[in-house]
């Protein structure tokens, strides 16, 4: 399928996607009943969309195009009520978190969807292992060239986004010692990590044409880069965050990305070059492994800085942009989080350290989601 032309969209508009866990009490393992829930709610959603993801234990909540985080929060809140009622009617529960702490990937059923079934044929068991749960944020752009500039700019802050959203310390019944273990699941995919370097939209079109020769890429949706342009929406999509435990944190993360995008495209503070990516995977690893306690290294100067310090600097830089787009509350909340030194991964570990079980942890996450 050829790459569509870049659809011009209103700059800095938002679209947010949350991949949620569908769980089956009282054992709180993943259920395989997302299709049943989708059928139950499809005529009751008035704004946004509830849809399938890769496997039957995953449920995606997606907003429509939103002006700001307040509009997105309203849509999510309405969807949440409908989904929670349908889940209760079917004796199921819903929660966030980047991974389910003890599910077995071998039990996961891939959705009966043409694209996902084709992906299963291409990638085999890797697709079942990809039963992990992330937050994706789309930001509108006025042109393809703006999208490429924004993609490179946001890529500088991938470690910051990962550290702030880290919520996947447990996997397959084990403490992984990572704050965010979810991104590791995609490490075997040939398109894992950053997009290959291009400097403008024309070069991106050539890149996509080359990738399509592999026969594994039918559309932009088949590429699993950390950040990717979405020409059919006219957006740049950031895909590195774990799904948070609460809607409020998800909305705050979206506000952070929207404000960062506004700062990048209005001030153009960087002259991007391929060398910017020299230490990308090392810095990304630090964020996944250690969260805000990780240390990132500047590929140009060799300077090292804690992610706590680097994130506080980013929040300070984008505060004026946040005021302009109505995201100040998000930046203030994230600032409090960084100063406190807490993230959701650490809260999960604290629960287990205090004697809680992994079953109890999932139950608690369901209560958090339902009680917000």
From Swiss-Prot:
Molecular-function GO term, any one: ATP binding
Enzyme class: ligase
Reactions catalysed: L-cysteine + L-glutamate + ATP = gamma-L-glutamyl-L-cysteine + ADP + phosphate + H(+)
InterPro entries per the UniProt record, alphabetical: GCL_type2/YbdK_subfam (IPR050141), GCS2 (IPR006336), Gln_synth/guanido_kin_cat_dom (IPR014746), YbdK (IPR011793)
Record-listed E.C. numbers: 6.3.2.2
One BP annotation, GO: modified amino acid biosynthetic process
Entry-linked Gene3D superfamilies: 3.30.590.20
Keywords, comma-separated and alphabetical: ATP-binding, Ligase, Nucleotide-binding
SUPFAM superfamilies assigned to the protein according to its UniProt record, in alphabetical order: Glutamine synthetase/guanido kinase (SSF55931)
Alphabetized Pfam families for the sequence: GCS2 (PF04107)
Protein name as annotated: Putative glutamate--cysteine ligase 2
Gene that this sequence comes from: ybdK
